[in-house]
A protein has these predicted regions:
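Structural detector for short beta-strands of small beta-barrel domains
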Residues: 12-31
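Conserved hydrophobic positions within beta-strands
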Residues: 18-20, 148, 180
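Short, non-transmembrane alpha-helical segments in secretory-pathway proteins
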Residues: 126-148
Length: 185
């Protein structure tokens, strides 16, 4: 089944990484490295980790670095997993740096790394579950600062990870081994 891959696709698997603030019993605010604010809602099924160890919501404190995975709907994520003090990886970047969104600020038309040759905006199938989580984590490790609002599996087996709230990159390409291979506007 093919889904149209556009900003109005509805809630889908995604996530964000940043600093927690305004912590309450039902969630918190996450501020990304580019200043984007994302509302994080807790669900009864939300799991928590501190680094790589199981934790509870009490691990989330103001100022703590967090990685949130879940269902993204615009600037709100209903969390399935919250990782406090996420482990830092050794992800390699195909180039470029995240350009935060600012009204009137120009983005970039830069294309870096490998863009799948058969990639066509709007093609592919929405990914979910562990697959979407792994692609989201890989994309955010290389290009933090935005919010991933969907992961699309392409016909060649790669993933297009859609990044919102930034001027660049909007499309982050991740291979089947969950390594970032390219990015574009």
């Amino acid at each position: 089944m093919l889904f149209r891959s556009n900003a109005r696709s509805g809630p889908a698997a995604g996530g964000s990484v940043g600093t927690a603030s305004g912590v309450t019993s039902s969630g918190f605010t996450l501020t990304t490295s580019t200043g984007q604010q994302v509302t994080i809602k807790e669900a009864s099924s939300t799991t928590y980790e501190q680094g790589t160890s199981p934790a509870s919501i009490s691990a989330v404190t103001s100022g703590a670095p967090v990685l949130v995975l879940g269902t993204t709907d615009s600037s709100t994520i209903t969390a399935s997993q919250v990782i406090v003090d996420p482990p830092s990886g050794s992800a390699s970047s195909p180039g470029g740096q995240t350009i935060g969104y600012a009204k009137g600020k120009q983005g970039s038309t830069e294309k870096v790394g490998t863009i799948p040759s058969d990639y066509s905006q709007g093609s592919g199938t929405l990914a979910s579950g562990t697959t979407a989580d792994k692609a989201t984590e890989a994309a955010l490790a290389v290009y933090p600062g935005g919010t991933i609002d969907r992961v699309v599996k392409l016909s060649n087996g790669d993933y297009e990870v859609h990044n919102i709230g930034v001027n660049w990159p909007h499309h982050i390409f991740v291979n089947a081994d969950f390594q970032v291979i390219g990015a574009d506007d």
